[in-house]
A protein has these predicted regions:
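Intrinsically disordered, low-complexity polar regions and short flexible loop motifs
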Residues: 1-205
Length: 205
């Protein structure tokens, strides 16, 4: 049985061109082993508190590429993303807030983690704008949407110059999703969209 104060975190490697990494908390507690770019860990139960997070290149624990203190409140559900380009790697926290969800609906939000992309709009093919003028490191509010299969495009704000086209996004009912834009508009790895099921869909805190 979990402590009533337990929090849940997952890790996301969203740093373009960074190698696969190992992530440790408070010295020797491993949170992620050989986590590659674009990958998430499962949600991990952790106690609230202050943690020292060390990120190393996978299988090389000599010198961390990032050391950061992380304060985690109780009963939090969150994604901890490694973002930015080396050597300016940083940790970015995306909380999954608990909020009402009407039966047979979905909720989506957009998280802009592409370090060289401008502010963008997220658009449906019919021109309907789902999210507008979202800048780097912005997290939108959740938007209620009918469960279905969707296509979206990402374009610099106020233009129809699509930089990413993503078809066949299947949204299930009674679920929360985040659309994470990662990668680079100019360079490799190119911009892509990750669409995981958020922990607030199924984790009770």
């Amino acid at each position: 049985m979990r402590d009533k104060k337990t929090s849940y975190i997952r890790l996301l490697h969203a740093s373009p061109k960074a190698p696969a990494v190992d992530v440790y908390a408070n010295g020797d507690n491993i949170l992620a082993d050989d986590l590659s770019y674009g990958e998430f860990t499962p949600y991990l139960p952790v106690m609230p508190g202050t943690y020292t997070i060390d990120i190393y290149p996978a299988d090389n624990s000599d010198t961390p590429i990032l050391t950061k203190e992380l304060v985690l409140p109780e009963k939090t559900i969150a994604t901890i993303a490694a973002i930015g380009e080396l050597p300016e790697l940083e940790l970015f926290i995306v909380e999954d807030p608990k909020e009402p969800l009407q039966p047979n609906t979905s909720k989506i939000r957009f998280v802009h983690l592409s370090p060289d992309a401008p502010a963008v709009d997220v658009i449906e093919p019919n021109g309907s704008i789902l999210f507008k003028d979202v800048s780097y490191k912005d997290i939108t509010d959740y938007l209620s949407i009918t469960p279905d299969t969707y296509t979206v495009e990402i374009a610099p704000t106020g233009t129809d110059n699509s930089v990413l086209f993503v078809p066949n996004i299947r949204l299930l009912p009674d679920a929360f999703y985040s659309l994470y834009a990662i990668g680079l508009v100019e360079g490799d790895p190119y911009l892509q969209l990750l669409i995981p099921l958020d922990g607030n869909s199924y984790i009770e805190t």
